[in-house]
Each structure stands twice: as structure tokens, then as C-alpha cells.
């Protein structure tokens, strides 16, 4: 992720607070680049069974890069098994898929059984999101400055979902954190949630997550 003249790598050492502060402090649009095939190849090294979950291919080239790396790796390591999953999503749903993969592997299932089970599971998962700021959408030209200003002044939160094809779609606009929590809860019920694991990913918004969790 490039913000002005600084480059941030999204790994375990990333200082997210510093990155966000830098992002909000500059008027320039931020830019991002997906992992290269070489990045994936280094991660594959030494493994016999590999499961890889990428952010939705509609937002990033990560999935295509991973598929290319898979094909390259299998040329030299034909006995390795690799399954690349396009999450068709982002954020918490990616975490949900990774957690489920770990559960399936811990059950001692074969590689093929894990592939079948995670494919079935993914059909039942869903991403809902609440966006409190639209600064980067304005900077990147995806939203007009006028709309961005109105959203900020009226404290409007965007409530949306990842579609079945992996695009991010707007569902509702809610004014203020309380109404956005209610809107998110309504969308969860509308989506047919009837129990099961929920992953909530947030940045500096623990209060809203707790309010939703308490519903």
C-alpha cells in the first residue's frame, strides 16, 4: 500500500495506526499492489498441502497472481497439492474461511475432503460491512467531493455486502453509529442467519462491534 511517498506492506509487522494516520494526513490517493507470484512461491516453499484464500478477485489481482504461482510451483513440485480460493469477499469473511479450513484440517480430513467441505461452507458465508469514512473513496475518485462532504457532515454510515460475484454493494445508508448497528443487524437477519460463527473485524470501532454482539 503506497501512501504519498511511504510504502506499507500488509504483513504481521504492519503498524496499522501509523498507516491510517499517514493516509488521513495526505490529500493524495493511496495506491495498492497485490502480492507477486514470487511472494506466493516463497510462502509455498516446503509445504505439501497448501490452501490459499485471497481477497475477492473483483478488487485485486491477488487471485490471478496466486493461480499463476500455483501453476509455476506445480511444474517443479508435481506432488504438492494446492487449492486457491477466491473468497469473493474481504475482511471478516476471509478470516471465517481460514478458521474453517483450520477446523477441517484439525479433523484429519484428506486434502480432497477439505476442498469439498470448504467449498460447501463458502456457499453459506456472507460479508456485511459498515463504512464510517469515505475519505479514500473521494481521494481515489470513486465518490464526488460533494457527496463525501455530505456523508461526513451528516455522520452517514454505509452498510453494504459482498455479492455472490465478489463485488461490494451498498445496501443501506444509516445516520450515526446506533442506527448503523441496527441496520447491520437487520441485514444479518434478512440474510437468513440462524446461528453459527460470526467474525467481526473492525478498526477503532470496538463499541459498535460490542453493541452488535450484544444483540
PLM feature segments, named:
Residues 77-81:
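A short helix-to-beta-strand connector/capping loop
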Residues 25-26, 46-47, 124, 194:
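Structured helix-beta-strand junction loops
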Residues 52, 82-84:
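Conserved beta-strand scaffold positions in the cores of enzyme catalytic domains, especially
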